């Protein structure tokens, strides 16, 4: 019984230790925020830009009386409520009155005029660790503009929710696009901070040597752990990634976007469903289940 209790205690302790991480935004708030007090600040953020207590970075900046002059927002928008691929117009944050510049509309990179009144650009967005998830493309284009305009670029790092595990082939650079910009694996195993360092070190942007890049690192991140091991609330990074399981499935099932098969977007179970009116579901299920994928069973569903 003592041994059994020891195992249970050890397991609980492991869970607690895995959950006891400090996000980049937590470290920034406690240790670095005074360094930008006299700067003109722009934020590249969305609804996931929360500290460990659930407070949004805009509230943190406002409470510390920092000079916030502009907000940039990626695909899915500032509030994360726009569907994939939908172009988004510039608008205004109703709380601060600050301009919100869309980087998924007419332009995918900040314009020269939008960078003119900025001293420092802070990136704080939860990525999901997949090459074709566009937040890292937005990160790259913003880094390039920061280098061009001599603007400090700070990344508040966050865990890769899919851990540091790597899966999939490297991108053929001849097919580089906004949904696959760099020669990295599909499931790349990196944080956004590590991606930013890789981009700068490999000179994947123009004027990379001029970029003044600062990464505010996560503290006590165990890169072997999936997101559910941490004592953090899952905030859906986009409308069709409602939970961690969907993020894991997205790694492979998002490839169906390049075909005439639906991946279930807009349903209650995106990427857990796929299909088409012309598919013979019985034959397909029989064929897929013969692979005996660990933890996966295919069954017939109907959806619109």
Language-model features, listed with the residues they occupy:
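N-terminal phosphate-binding or glycine-rich loops at protein starts, especially the Walker A/P-loop
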Residues: 21-66
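A short helix->loop->beta-strand "cap" motif at the edges of active sites that frequently abuts
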Residues: 66, 148-152
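Glycine-rich oxoanion-binding loops at beta->alpha junctions
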Residues: 88-118, 130
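Glycine/threonine-rich flexible loop motifs
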Residues: 127-139
